[in-house]
């Protein structure tokens, strides 16, 4: 069992697969596509909790950058290595700073919500950044309309994937997300919301009756106009305060 998947015990009928997240693409309305626009071409990137390396590989190809991954789970680290990602099988610890050196970007792609102490991790990440460097992170929006609707119905049902992933330890609104980063001594440069067209709710009636291209346009527009209600994930770029 991968270390993080154990936190799903008691909330699902069976444990989520450690390989459940993959198959991302660079759709500009979704989180990985948004992440790619926040990473400068040729940057040196540290992908913390890189998992199977699917996001790392996309970033390497799209941004022509060098990516080093950190992944404590051996099976996921092996999968990332098979994609050509240079992976260190460890957690983010201070002792890695001399080994890995400074980075232009430290990436947390759907990672901070799985941590007991995201504040401490963000503070440590600053030590891996060179001057002018930034953290880029994606996090789920717990104030999404689907969560609000279920709460009105008296339900807070965990799922294997998505906003209600049973292995999440932390929950974020845009306000609590910004508070976390400012308290950790970052200056927020940009925050954008993803459409989340992959969510299960959009795969069933009445949403499935809408042509995919039209639905993508509607969801993207809604996420931009009302991100706190329709944004599935927030993608943030934040620089270290000097």
Enumerate the predicted regions with their spans.
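Conserved N-terminal segment of class I S-adenosyl-L-methionine
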Residues: 1-105, 119-122, 193-196, 205-206, ...
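Short catalytic micro-motifs in class I SAM-dependent methyltransferases
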Residues: 109-114
């Amino acid at each position: 069992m991968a270390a993080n998947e154990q936190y799903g015990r008691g909330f699902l009928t069976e444990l989520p697969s450690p390989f459940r997240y993959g198959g991302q693409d660079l759709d500009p309305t979704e989180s990985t596509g948004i992440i790619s626009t926040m990473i400068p071409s040729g940057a040196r990137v540290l992908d913390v909790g890189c998992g199977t390396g699917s996001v790392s590989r996309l970033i390497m190809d799209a941004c022509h950058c060098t990516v080093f991954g950190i992944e404590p789970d051996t099976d996921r680290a092996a999968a990332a290595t098979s994609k050509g990602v240079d992976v260190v099988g460890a957690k983010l610890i201070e002792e890695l700073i001399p080994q890995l050196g400074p980075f232009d970007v430290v990436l947390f792609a759907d990672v901070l919500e799985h941590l007991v102490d995201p504040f401490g991790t963000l503070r440590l990440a600053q030590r891996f950044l060179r001057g002018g460097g930034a953290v880029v992170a994606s996090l789920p929006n717990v104030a999404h309309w689907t969560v609000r609707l279920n709460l009105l119905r008296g339900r807070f049902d965990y799922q294997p994937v998505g906003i209600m992933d049973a292995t999440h330890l932390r929950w974020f609104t845009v306000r609590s997300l910004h508070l976390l980063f400012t308290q950790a001594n970052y200056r927020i440069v940009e925050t954008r919301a993803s459409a989340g067209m992959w969510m299960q709710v959009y795969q069933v009636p009445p949403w499935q009756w809408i042509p995919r291209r039209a639905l993508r346009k509607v969801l993207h527009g809604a996420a931009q106009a009302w991100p706190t209600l329709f944004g599935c994930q927030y993608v943030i770029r934040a620089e270290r305060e000097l």
